[in-house]
């Protein structure tokens, strides 16, 4: 079998608050790379503090791609991400640099590296109609509707998973075929790069939970609520009938802050809900990552040497990297 001649890339994966951003920036500086963000919140303009978006200094230190692609009232699909990510990777390689994919959105990683089954594109009007229907009858009723239309998909989608219920119904209403049909169709071509997958994950869950809580408190101190107030004040956001169903507002932390500003509970309760929602997100991310059988796992604080050796061996170089911090 011929050797794989595709250019090399590194994927820095892991649950939220595990230190991916810091490691990706450090690796890019050390090995000559550019960062491709793999995060479904960072594609939205205005989601900065609450999404831990790399700041101006970080972007000045290392080129970043796929940030601020859409306004918060717009929709951005995994298929769009796959196309944009592959374009970015090709451009980075053409410049003689190493693409470093970094983030925590598993669907985006899969779309960029493995391809997605061909599926109807998102239709904002259909999504809004489904959201309006959910306001009337509830998402549980829409999940029951999905079970009648597509029992295979309904069995895989939890009755409280609004985003996936909405997408499954949207696909059916657009195409007349259930989403499970589309998911069995052949995926796109493989990625134009050969990837080393690195998973950053503290071995002790308590460590990750502490990082999550600490990061949220820092975000609140840095003005997260003011950021959400500014989003709410945008005329285009005020015109949306069900803003809580927008993908941008569904981002962890933003929903809880939005509901607090709507008058639901105290700030302390909102903070605790956001911490809990972020823990649940981290749990889902870890579950998905365990299915990445070709990924190599590292504790960001304990496995310094092994992480360095993995990168150096993959890239054919032997150099040291500075200790990444939790970002």
From Swiss-Prot:
Name this protein carries in UniProt: tRNA dimethylallyltransferase
Disulfide pairings: none
Entry keyword annotation includes Cytoplasm: no
InterPro entries xref list: Dimethylallyltransferase, IPT, P-loop_NTPase
Coiled coil regions, renumbered to chain: none
Catalytic EC class: transferase
Keyword NADP annotated: no
Gene: miaA
EC numbers on record: 2.5.1.75
Requisite cofactors: Mg(2+)
